[in-house]
Every structure is written in structure tokens, then in C-alpha cells.
Amino acid sequence: MNIHEYQAKAVLREFGVPVSHGYPIFKASEAEAAAKQLGGPVWVVKSQIHAGGRGKGKFKEASAGDKGGVRLAKSIDEVKDYAQQMLHATLVTVQTGPAGKQVNRLYVEEGSEIDKEFYLSLLVDRATSRISFVVSTEGGMSIEDVAHDTPEKIVSFTVDPATGIMAHHGRAVANTLGLKGEQAKQAESLVTKLYTAFLAKDMEMLEINPLVLTKQGDLKCLDAKMSFDGNALYRHADIQALRDETEEDAKEIEASKYDLNYVTLDGTIGCMVNGAGLAMATMDIIKLYGMTPANFLDVGGGASKEKVTAAFKIITADPNVKGILINIFGGIMKCDIIAEGVVAAVKEVGLDVPLVVRLEGTNVEAGKKIIKHSGLNVLPADNLDDAAQKIVNAVKQVA
């Protein structure tokens, strides 16, 4: 789960991490009060969306002006003007895709006098099963670009969970960033606080870009991006309360209500499969035969008729879906349950695209019988290869 920048900074503030003061606003009329509360003389007005590249982004609407999603204001009137322009406008960045995202909230923050910009992040390194620090002197820009152009400017190290964070980790960050004396001590303290927050809140990623050294000689987190382990949210009600569903895919939200593993993709063939491995294999073979999947959907091992019906409805709600492939290998999952769910869903929502069903495993004959006698226009398949070819050919014929 992701949260907004201003929410991430509030979390960091709980752990004593130095961040700039600011106020979120949801209406343009709130901008003046926020600016006056901060005092000035310089403010930063930041679009709050779940995507990076906001500063270099562009708004679709001409009324939003030609500046990016992060703007420097030198007067209260300028703060008010920016709020009026940016709120409810559509911001397009390198991470939003061409559709962009609507800006429904802004963060008005005090300006900072910046001497140097750095990059610092923590993430779960799956290769080592440890928390990894990624550090660079090249802050305020895309770390992907730095990794591509000057990889030698990125340093990373992992933390042994048996020892936890230690003083030498902080010194490693300070040395990488070229910090000495008082600034080195600040870096050591910051590293400990960030690691503590990362563990305490079950984060998957914490990115500070940029981490700045101000002209007053202080380290400050000027931006913050966080994502959390969804499986751990049950023990973090405070974090779960920060969820902004308007930033998420509506189909993925609906799928989560039924404990379905669903991810929207940009293809045209909807997939319903049980098991993540089989789901990925199904997506691969669709690609092999020249088309692309519209989603990843794993209904799990013990899905009920209602769960299968919900899954089918979610797939058909996607206007990009031109065909559907259901691929079930029944172990714990029974093929007749899948068949009943599919039939119920089709009768409820209708079927305007080709549907191929491949069933194998527990109660397979009963499942095939249910499909056969349903009166629905369903193409049966004997195996995965057969199923993929049939759905691809069927979609091409319709097109």
C-alpha cells in the first residue's frame, strides 16, 4: 500500500526524522491559511499523487499553467494562484502514463535553502532477505537514470537482522555522501531513525529523494515516498487509515474485498487462473501466441462459487478485454465450483466476448458437464496450449 508524501512525512516525524513543516489542503480556499501559518517567505506547493516525477510533470489542462506539479511560490497570492490552478487538474508524469492522475490534494510546505541534494532509500532486498540501504550523491533526480548513466555513484549495503542497525551503517552513509563532523553525526542519527521506522511500520520501501543539506548545515528529508506490506496492515490500523482509494485501480480494490490477487495490465485477454505460477504461465503463453493479457488474476486454491462470480465480473468490467481465458487446475479447487461460478456470472452480466475454458483436476468431468449444459457459447480446451491458441484466434476473428 502506498501513501501520499505529506502522510509519509507525518510518519517520519513520529520517529524524530527531520522533515519540513507543511499543511495538506483539499480546497483552493485553504491555501491562504496554510501559507500564513507557515509564515514564508518562500513556500512550495506540491501535487499529492501516488506517482513520481511530479516536478517535471505537466498538467493536461491549459488552465493549470505550464509549470510542473511542484511549484515554488514567493508570495501568499502566488500560493493561492497555484492552488487554484493545480487542484482537480490532471498531472501527467513519467510514472502515470499518458492518462495522468487527477490532483485532489496539495501539500503547502515551507521552503528550504538547499546546499546539496542526496538520495537515500531503504527497501527489502529479496536476494539476501535483508533490508538494504541505497545511497547516492545524485539526489533530486531519477535514481533509475543515475543507475543507467553513472552506476558508480550508487552505493548499497544490507543490514544483518541479527545485529540490527549499527553505528558503522551510519558512517557508511556519511562517507558515501561526503559528510564530516556534525553533518556525519546527523547522518548516523538519521540512518538509525529511518531503519527503526521501516521496521516498526512494516514498510516495503522508504525513499528520500532528495535528502538535502541546508545552507544552515542541517540534514532534512525534503521528499518522502513509502509503501507498506499489505499482509501486515492488520497490525497497523493507523497506516491503513491513510489509504487513498482514489489513487488505486477500482478493479483491484473490488478484488481485494474478495481476497483475489488481481493486477490490471494493458492487454486485451482477460485471465482467470488458480495459482500464481499457473497464472504467470498462462500470461506467458498468451504472449507467445501474439497477444497480451489484460490482467493477472489468481482466485486461489479454495475459491467459492461467489468468489469465482466476483472474479468474472471484475474481468468483464474492463472495457479493454476482448476475450477471456479461464485456466483451472483443480487440486483443492474443484472444477465444478469454478464452472458454477462462471455460469452464474455470465447469466448475470452477459457475455459479449469469446470465452475459452480449460479445466483439469478434481471433479473435472462434473465441471465440463456444467459448462456444456449451460447453453452458453463457451469454447472448451483440452490443455493450456490449446486454450491459448483458441482464445487468441477467437479474438482475432472478432476483431
From Swiss-Prot:
Gene3D superfamilies, A to Z: ATP-grasp fold, A domain, ATP-grasp fold, B domain, Succinyl-CoA synthetase domains
Biological pathway: Carbohydrate metabolism; tricarboxylic acid cycle; succinate from succinyl-CoA (ligase route): step 1/1
Named cofactor requirement(s): Mg(2+)
GO MF entries: ATP binding; magnesium ion binding; succinate-CoA ligase (ADP-forming) activity; succinate-CoA ligase (GDP-forming) activity
Domain ATP-grasp, residue spans: 9-254
Binding site for ATP: 46, 53-55, 109, 112, 117
Keyword line: ATP-binding, Ligase, Magnesium, Metal-binding, Nucleotide-binding, Tricarboxylic acid cycle
Record's GO cellular component terms: cytosol; succinate-CoA ligase complex
Reaction equations catalysed: succinate + ATP + CoA = succinyl-CoA + ADP + phosphate; GTP + succinate + CoA = succinyl-CoA + GDP + phosphate
Entry binding sites for substrate: 274, 331-333
Cofactor note: Binds 1 Mg(2+) ion per subunit.
A Pfam family matched in the record: Ligase_CoA
EC number of this enzyme: 6.2.1.5
One GO term of the biological process aspect: succinyl-CoA metabolic process
InterPro entries: ATP-grasp (IPR011761), ATP-grasp_succ-CoA_synth-type (IPR013650), ATP_grasp_subdomain_1 (IPR013815), SUCC_ACL_C (IPR005811), Succ_CoA_ligase-like_bsu (IPR005809), Succinyl-CoA_synth-like (IPR016102)
Residues where Mg(2+) binds: 209, 223
Stated family: Belongs to the succinate/malate CoA ligase beta subunit family.
Purpose of the protein: Succinyl-CoA synthetase functions in the citric acid cycle (TCA), coupling the hydrolysis of succinyl-CoA to the synthesis of either ATP or GTP and thus represents the only step of substrate-level phosphorylation in the TCA. The beta subunit provides nucleotide specificity of the enzyme and binds the substrate succinate, while the binding sites for coenzyme A and phosphate are found in the alpha subunit.
The protein's assembly and partners: Heterotetramer of two alpha and two beta subunits.
The name this protein goes by in its record: Succinate--CoA ligase [ADP-forming] subunit beta
Organism for this UniProt entry: Rhodopseudomonas palustris (strain BisB5)
